[in-house]
């Protein structure tokens, strides 16, 4: 109700009713969501309960709502774990870039708290179903699956496939059953990753591995790729494209740039490459929060606007 409407309705009240409302305001008792006057008479029809918040509290609540909406729009999330500033190539030396992209994809099918690979409707994804889901040849799948087993990423239990909670987990982290303090983690949004995997098939699959590869260097609040992602904002050292290329094993920086700029979801770039303000020959790297975002709710809007 607008302020003008409130004033109009107040002016239409009789003198006795106005006196009663003012008395109710001074002496009201709230019980079980109902409003009673000093005589115990229910006056809920004359009163409206509201929570009084400060501007800062209202902004925080709005930010939380925005994060919840963001999670819903992008298919909710799975926690992806990694060791900060340690490349995925170091953690999984046997994996090719397409392997890393496939690993990221199957992580989105991690069951809530169980770690079991399953569809959103609860249907179990066994080994044969996983081969179909990934969409590669039988021989290539057999090789990939063997790598998953050897790296202790998945285990078979009674025909079901369970994923290691130190790689992907859905649910409260205290329910994982693992000590995960040595790892960092981020929210990886399931629908976005699945949509990207459906778009970038065949030879293009390797491009998606870059998303997974940059996670250990991603600052949580800003989604900027950094040398020191865990430090405070004032101390962050953003990584240039040249450095990222060297880190990921690209001999040609321009090839990496084209790969990054070529990944798009619903018309939005997955990577934004702004120029370094102090040296326009250098480019920074920012990741679209529709794919991954680990920051607090109040930081989301500032990152999203870069991609809108």
Q: Each PLM stretch: what is its role?
A:
Residues 1-22, 26, 112-163, 223-282:
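Winged helix-turn-helix DNA-binding recognition segment
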Residues 1-120, 158, 168-236:
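Short recognition helix of helix-turn-helix/winged-helix DNA-binding domains
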Residues 126, 159-181, 276-299:
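Short, cationic-aromatic polyanion-contact patches
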């Amino acid at each position: 109700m607008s302020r003008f409407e409130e004033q109009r309705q107040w002016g239409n009240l009789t003198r006795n009713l106005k006196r009663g409302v003012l008395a109710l305001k001074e002496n009201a008792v709230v019980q079980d969501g109902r409003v009673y006057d000093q005589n115990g008479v229910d006056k809920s029809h004359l009163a409206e309960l509201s929570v009084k918040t400060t501007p800062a509290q209202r902004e925080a609540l709005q930010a939380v709502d925005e994060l919840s909406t963001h999670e819903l729009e992008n298919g909710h999330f799975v926690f992806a774990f990694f060791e900060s500033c340690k490349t995925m190539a170091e953690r999984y030396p046997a994996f090719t870039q397409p392997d890393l992209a496939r690993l990221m994809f199957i992580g989105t099918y991690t069951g809530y708290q169980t770690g079991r690979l399953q569809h959103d409707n609860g249907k179990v994804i066994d080994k044969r179903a996983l081969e179909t889901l990934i969409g590669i040849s039988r021989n290539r799948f057999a090789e990939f699956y063997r790598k998953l087993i050897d790296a202790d990423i998945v285990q078979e239990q009674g025909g079901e496939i369970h994923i290691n909670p130190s790689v992907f987990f859905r649910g409260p982290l205290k329910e994982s059953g693992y000590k995960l303090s040595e790892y960092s983690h981020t929210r990886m949004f399931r629908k976005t990753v699945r949509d990207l995997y459906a778009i970038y098939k065949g030879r293009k699959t390797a491009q998606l591995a870059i998303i997974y590869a940059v996670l250990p260097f991603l600052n949580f609040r800003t989604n900027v790729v950094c040398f020191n992602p865990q430090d405070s904002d004032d101390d962050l050292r953003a990584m240039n494209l040249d450095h990222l290329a060297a880190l990921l094993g690209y001999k040609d920086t321009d090839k990496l740039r084209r790969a990054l700029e070529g990944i798009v979801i619903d018309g939005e770039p997955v990577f934004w490459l702004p120029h370094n303000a102090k040296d326009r020959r250098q480019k920074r790297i920012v990741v679209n929060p529709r794919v991954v975002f680990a920051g607090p709710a109040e930081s989301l809007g500032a990152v999203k606007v870069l991609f809108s």
